[in-house]
């Protein structure tokens, strides 16, 4: 048996599949036929360059094809790898995809397409196809082991248009400690995006919008936890931040309409029907928009 066949055995994989073709190129290189011995740093550059060349100029249709190829590769490719190589290859691919979608493009349409294509896997955080739970490195680095999730990155950069999409798909509701996202929006150092003064204004407005959006999802926001951070010397990105969190999230009784929204969204979330399931409900369009966090 050849060295490359020891590494991977092909049973059925479309020749046009981007990731199958990439594997073929890697294992056929004489210098990389002992992948387990040399480690990911030997083949990571080729994976990144190949995917980056596609993602740099890809349109939505092309991105749809790339995601379909990745899903087919993971689910049905028939490849059998050494365990370490399999993990490393998929992690590098996911890191590259998320890096380009969130850190380089920052295009809401691409984010929404990624969520649509992978929503069937989102309930299993350990699944390689639950891309929204995988980590990536915002300043590209081959290993994403010390990376962050897309939701945390969007909170750090206060990309309100993308945060809204993530929230509509129930990503914040799936968080174990959603208050951490609120704290990140409010207190994370603004140098992530600030280059000139006018961008500071933009990021402050985005931070306000992000706080309002989170208030549409959560029933309670712990002001005490925020104030604890402030007492440690951390400075909020906006001075009047409390004006953008309704008093019904931390002091007054929560509105009945909001409690109903939370309950309905929770049921839809359990059945993995956010946000599309909202629009199949036999209710007025105004209430559908309310459930979809439009107001």
Swiss-Prot record:
The keyword Isomerase does not apply. It comes from the Eukaryota. Residues 232-295 form the SOCS box domain. InterPro entries: Ankyrin_rpt-contain_sf (IPR036770), ASB17 (IPR039147), SOCS_box (IPR001496), SOCS_box-like_dom_sf (IPR036036). ANK repeats lie at residues 146-176. Keywords: ANK repeat, Ubl conjugation pathway. GO terms for biological process: intracellular signal transduction; protein ubiquitination. Pathway: Protein modification; protein ubiquitination. The SOCS box domain mediates the interaction with the Elongin BC complex, an adapter module in different E3 ubiquitin-protein ligase complexes. Belongs to the ankyrin SOCS box (ASB) family. May be a substrate-recognition component of a SCF-like ECS (Elongin-Cullin-SOCS-box protein) E3 ubiquitin-protein ligase complex which mediates the ubiquitination and subsequent proteasomal degradation of target proteins. This is Ankyrin repeat and SOCS box protein 17. It comes from Canis lupus familiaris.
